[in-house]
């Protein structure tokens, strides 16, 4: 249970370490994070802080969201995210509070969640890393097919979860234990080592790494 930030993926670039080594980094814009709601165990059944970021035209905000943001006294944002916190940590926040990138430090490990790029309808070889069937020697029309998808009359059905062709990508995805290389407090940017899911300008959520003991 720890606080994170919501933002967008700007893109990838590289920076140079003091020894001249090249470090590939992803630039994340974490500006304008603000608290929209405090959820407590008494009223909501769990403790969490709800956060939004960015800005949205008033004409693009529905009445339910407009009322929600107005109640918090904040400008309408692009989306909402929640971070579970302890009751003690929750007491440090109130609706309207700003959250800056300074909650993270250089060298800290974080988990970054985004929506992966959609690849359209794909076969099992591309989607699930299946192997191709034989190129010849008795095989004439089944080179890239998945093969058998079941057994016989018993059980007489395809089991749920069977890996088959279908939509590839465009799903929520998390990359764990990415190292923060730089924190730009002036521009509210975070530079993490490596790649994160999604296309440019896609929404991302950054949390302290679970595996690092956060």
Curated annotation (Swiss-Prot):
Annotated PROSITE patterns: RIBOSOMAL_L3
Pfam family, one: Ribosomal_L3
Transmembrane segments: none
Job of this protein: One of the primary rRNA binding proteins, it binds directly near the 3'-end of the 23S rRNA, where it nucleates assembly of the 50S subunit.
Family annotation (InterPro entries): Ribosomal_uL3, Ribosomal_uL3_bac/org-type, Ribosomal_uL3_CS, Transl_B-barrel_sf
One CC-aspect GO term: cytosolic large ribosomal subunit
Organism: Chromobacterium violaceum (strain ATCC 12472 / DSM 30191 / JCM 1249 / CCUG 213 / NBRC 12614 / NCIMB 9131 / NCTC 9757 / MK)
Family statement: Belongs to the universal ribosomal protein uL3 family.
Protein name per its UniProtKB record: Large ribosomal subunit protein uL3
Gene Ontology BP terms: translation
Keyword RNA-binding: yes
PTM annotation, UniProt: Methylated by PrmB.
Keywords per UniProt: Methylation, Ribonucleoprotein, Ribosomal protein, RNA-binding, rRNA-binding
Chain positions with N5-methylglutamine modification: 153
Subunit structure comment from the entry: Part of the 50S ribosomal subunit. Forms a cluster with proteins L14 and L19.
Top-rank taxon, per record: Bacteria
GO MF assignments: rRNA binding; structural constituent of ribosome
Ranges of biased composition (kind: Polar residues): 130-151
């Amino acid at each position: 249970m720890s606080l994170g930030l919501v933002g967008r993926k700007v893109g990838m670039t590289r920076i140079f370490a003091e020894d001249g080594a090249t470090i590939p980094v992803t630039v994340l814009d974490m500006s304008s994070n603000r608290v929209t709601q405090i959820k407590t165990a008494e009223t909501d059944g769990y403790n969490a802080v709800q956060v939004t970021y960015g800005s949205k035209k008033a004409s693009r905000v529905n009445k339910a969201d407009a009322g929600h943001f107005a109640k918090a006294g904040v400008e309408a944002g692009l989306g909402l995210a929640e971070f579970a916190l302890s009751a003690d940590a929750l007491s440090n926040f109130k609706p309207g509070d700003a959250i800056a990138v300074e909650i993270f430090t250089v060298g800290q490990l974080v988990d970054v969640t985004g929506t992966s790029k959609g690849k359209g309808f794909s076969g099992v070889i591309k989607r699930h890393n299946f192997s191709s069937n034989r190129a010849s020697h008795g095989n004439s029309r089944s080179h890239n097919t998945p093969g058998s998808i079941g057994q016989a009359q018993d059980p007489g059905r395809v089991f749920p979860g069977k890996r088959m062709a279908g939509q590839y990508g465009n799903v929520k995805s998390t990359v764990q234990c990415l190292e923060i290389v730089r924190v730009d407090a002036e521009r509210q940017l975070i530079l993490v080592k490596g790649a994160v899911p999604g296309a440019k300008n896609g929404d991302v959520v950054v949390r302290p790494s679970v595996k690092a003991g956060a």
